[in-house]
């Protein structure tokens, strides 16, 4: 009996017990590529059409220039070494030990192409790269641009081959905290809803289904909500029998602190996803209701920005809230996040 359980555990979990995702900011990726190109020769202005075309032309180049890592700065050396390690793990005895490369603050197709190009410099193949890049769209503006960004990605064959998995899915991560800070609660919630529907339509044009990774926190301001209600609120056609979400800070303790609560939470999560994925009578958003929500979203964002951009808001917030006292508590995340 013990051996049978051990075999089951090995079959389900492998030898690493869990998969570790890798996460990096798009600005760091851009700086690394800039450093490489400054060594190899000239390059165009960051963010320009010339920059995009240079990334794409190198990405399809069969033989890239040999890179001398000793000439790189510390940041670039670390990122390239990390990608080389990912490649080594993927080709080792337990390839599932490392997960996707999550690209935070994805703002353009060039950001996604740049990660793939760095992967090529790190030794990944030239026809189809095994590095699964997961774009993380976080701000209101980037969520609005996401469908067009993904269209550009799937118009480029090597990226299309690399980002679509064997089951026809592409993983996309959605940022709740930053979109909330960017536009307020109502604007953020509505923009995330619209973005999921638009991304699903964009991917379907290329025969791809979305696998959404929800970067939720515990509080309402960070997308926190009861698990079953949060899943029930997902737009039609966006679940597809699969869902990923983050569990941060106090959520880990409240939902996964012991075997009983963890089992209950996982049962609720899986049953809710299966139930709502199988619903066929979910109606589409009514156009009139969509117009109303669009107007409310715009008004709420304007009101929110008028508040947080007020000259006295920061001093008022510091006086009216226990933020300084909270900074003395050693919890999961810092009290203040610096840009």
Regions found by a protein language model. Give the residues of each.
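Short coil/turn segments at secondary-structure boundaries
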Residues: 3-7, 19-24, 96-103, 163-166, ...
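Catalytic cores of glycan-processing enzymes that make or break glycosidic bonds
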Residues: 3-11, 18, 113, 171-181, ...
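Extended, charge-enriched "interface" segments that sit outside catalytic cores
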Residues: 3-92
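Catalytic or ion-translocation cores adjacent to nucleophile or general acid/base/metal-coordination motifs
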Residues: 122-302
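Active-site phosphate/pyrophosphate-binding segments
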Residues: 292-300, 307-327
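Single conserved hydrophobic/aromatic residue that forms the stacking wall/gate
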Residues: 1-2, 329-339
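C-terminal amphipathic alpha-helical interaction region
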Residues: 66-87, 91-94, 101-115, 126, ...
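Glycine-rich, often proline-containing surface loops adjacent to acidic residues and nearby aromatics
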Residues: 16, 55-69, 92-100, 129-134, ...
């Amino acid at each position: 009996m013990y051996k049978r359980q051990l075999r089951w555990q090995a079959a389900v979990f492998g030898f690493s017990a869990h998969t570790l995702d890798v996460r990096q900011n798009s600005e760091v990726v851009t700086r690394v590529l800039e450093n490489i190109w400054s060594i190899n020769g000239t390059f165009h202005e960051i963010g320009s059409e010339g920059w995009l075309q240079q990334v794409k032309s190198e990405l399809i180049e069969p033989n890239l220039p040999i890179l001398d890592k000793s000439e790189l700065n510390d940041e670039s050396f670390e990122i390239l070494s990390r990608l080389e390690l990912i490649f080594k793990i993927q080709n080792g005895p337990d390839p599932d030990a490392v997960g996707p490369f999550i690209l935070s603050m994805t703002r353009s197709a060039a950001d996604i192409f740049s990660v793939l190009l760095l992967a090529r410099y790190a030794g990944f193949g030239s026809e189809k790269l095994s590095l699964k890049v997961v774009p993380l769209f976080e701000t209101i503006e980037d969520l609005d641009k996401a469908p067009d960004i993904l269209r550009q990605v799937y118009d480029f064959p090597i990226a299309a081959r690399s980002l679509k998995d064997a089951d026809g899915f592409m993983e996309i991560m959605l940022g709740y905290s930053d979109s909330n800070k960017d536009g307020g609660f109502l604007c953020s919630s509505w923009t995330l809803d619209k973005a999921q529907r638009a991304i699903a339509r964009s991917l379907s044009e290329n025969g791809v289904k979305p696998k959404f990774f929800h970067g939720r926190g515990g509080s309402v301001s960070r997308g926190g909500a009861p698990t079953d209600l949060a899943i029930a609120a997902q737009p039609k056609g966006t679940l597809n029998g699969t869902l990923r979400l983050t569990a941060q800070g106090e959520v880990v303790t409240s939902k996964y602190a012991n075997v009983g609560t963890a089992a209950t939470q996982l049962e609720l999560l899986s049953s809710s996803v299966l139930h709502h994925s199988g619903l066929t009578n979910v109606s589409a958003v009514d156009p009139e209701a969509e117009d109303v929500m669009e107007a409310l979203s715009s008004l709420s964002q304007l009101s929110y920005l008028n508040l947080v951009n007020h000259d006295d808001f920061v001093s008022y917030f510091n006086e009216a809230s226990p933020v300084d006292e909270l900074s003395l508590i050693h919890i999961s995340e810092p009290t203040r996040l610096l840009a």
